[in-house]
């Protein structure tokens, strides 16, 4: 993952300008939501290879601000475990290589890398980088299950990006799963309802970005964009 794109990871056929325009539009919606205290939902649609995942990753990568005090942290959620594994490893390797490079600040002072320099991030270990990467690329069912914990407040994430949102489970399928696998006999929501309710616990603003592939529902019980 170099230069804020994933051409080596996620095949895409869209023009770069289309992706830039789409990303800028979503960024504007996020900024308006922050400024006005709004809750917003965006739907990014397209055929396979259109660049939906790339748009979502670009936003998550720029806006994951865990531990900065900005209260904006973004999370990229996917039900595709191989994709999550590959993205985490690729991002970790890329950031690990970048941290070894001397930054402009250290060059100007004619120093070798300063272990306390935030630009170099020389002080970070590969394990620490991987932990940071895990905070903004997650399996969607882990995020969903967090919402079920007793007394669990709103998530730390103000921006949730759902990859392949058309594959979200219908109420019947998710309710049955929660009853039989999670010990939640009274659960009565679809996966979209559950995730929206979780993000709606924020008292001020929040933005949900749904990446939707039309007609790409694969298994029974997957809701499609209508849900």
Sequence positions of predicted segments:
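Conserved helicase motor core of SF1/SF2 NTP-dependent helicases
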Residues: 10-20, 27-30, 45-50, 54-55, ...
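Phosphate-binding P-loop
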Residues: 28-41
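Core RecA-like ATPase module of SF1/SF2 helicases and allied nucleic-acid translocases
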Residues: 96, 104, 126-130, 136, ...
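Disulfide-bonded cysteines in secreted/extracellular proteins and peptides
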Residues: 103-106, 117-120, 153
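Charged, low-complexity interaction regions
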Residues: 110-116
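Short glycine-rich substrate-engagement loop in P-loop NTPases that contacts/grips substrate
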Residues: 127-150
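A short acidic, Gly/Pro-enriched loop at the edge of an enzyme's catalytic core
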Residues: 155-157
């Amino acid at each position: 993952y170099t230069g804020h794109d994933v051409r080596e990871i996620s095949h895409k056929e869209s023009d770069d300008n289309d992706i830039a325009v789409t990303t800028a539009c979503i960024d504007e919606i996020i900024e308006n939501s922050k400024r006005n205290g709004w809750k917003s939902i965006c739907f990014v649609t397209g055929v396979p290879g259109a660049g939906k995942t790339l748009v979502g990753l670009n936003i998550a990568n720029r806006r994951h601000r865990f531990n900065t005090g900005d209260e904006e942290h973004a999370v990229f959620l996917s039900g595709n475990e191989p994709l999550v594994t590959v993205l985490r490893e690729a991002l970790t390797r890329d950031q690990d290589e970048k941290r070894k490079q001397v930054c402009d600040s250290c060059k100007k002072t004619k120093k070798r890398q300063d272990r306390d320099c935030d630009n170099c991030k020389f002080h970070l270990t590969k394990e620490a980088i991987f932990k940071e990467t895990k905070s903004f690329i997650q399996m969607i069912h882990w995020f969903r299950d967090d919402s079920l914990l007793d007394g669990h407040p709103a998530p730390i994430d103000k921006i949730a990006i759902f990859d392949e949102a058309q594959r979200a489970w219908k109420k019947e399928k998710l309710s049955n799963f929660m009853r039989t696998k999670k010990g939640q006999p009274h659960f009565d929501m679809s996966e979209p309802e559950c995730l929206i309710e979780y993000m709606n616990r924020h008292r001020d603003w929040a933005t949900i970005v749904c990446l939707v592939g039309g007609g790409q529902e694969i298994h029974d019980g997957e809701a499609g964009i209508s849900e």
